[in-house]
Amino acid sequence: VGSEMCIRDRNNSKPTVLVHTSGSTGKPKPLLIEKQRMLNSAKITCDFLGLKQGDKALLCMPLDFIAGKMMVVRGIERGMKIINVKPSGHPLSDEALRSANNDDEITFAAMVPLQVANSLEVPKERERLLAIKHLIIGGGAVDDEMADTLKAFPNAVWSTYGMTETLSHVALRRLSGKDASSWYEPFESVEIATTDDGCLVINAPLVCQAMLTTNDRVE
């Protein structure tokens, strides 16, 4: 039901959607974002990961936040099947997937670190996590222990950097395989700079109208 409401919101005649910022660039506040920029963001991610029509995308994030909304928009933009499960700490449990009537292999999923950590602890859920073709992890830091575990995963696993104002992520860090890295790489359409005191400045015109000065320090 939640994803259907999000789709209706996306398809109504208004050019904008109301979201609330996370506080990365200041005090949390309501923010009107353009639907076209949401589609731009979705296309950037889908193109980068090589997602295609008919892929299966797991929606296990609350739709109150940009991460959940953007999973729906990515599904719309790319023509993916959305597997909608109730947001919980165990999105790959038998109970969660049974409620979604899903037996399909999951192509693409976005999770927070806690969901990944919990899934790693349960053998059946760990097996399902291993089978996800493209997994992005955001909304919190990936600690060294988790990064070491994910490095051995056979498929593509990424940690994301972004915020509500950038309509989810603008940079990715590869966690799995021989290309695993300690550094985040911005998308080609994104430019970064620093302020005099070392804070990150983001210029991502396809997804954000103005340049953003964050509270994050650049190393």
What role is predicted for each listed range?
Residues 198, 210-219:
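AMP-binding/adenylate-forming catalytic core of the ANL superfamily
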Residues 15-43, 50:
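Conserved AMP-binding A3 loop
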Residues 121-177:
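Gly/Ser/Thr-rich phosphate-binding loop
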Residues 21-24, 57, 72, 109, ...:
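Conserved S/T- and glycine-rich ATP-binding loop of Class I adenylate-forming
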Residues 35-40, 56-118:
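AMP-binding/adenylate-forming
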Residues 155-197, 204-210:
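Conserved ATP-binding loop and adjacent catalytic segment of the adenylate-forming AMP-binding
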Residues 2-7:
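Short, small-residue-biased leader/transition segments that mark boundaries at the very start
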Residues 51-55:
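Short helix-loop-beta connector
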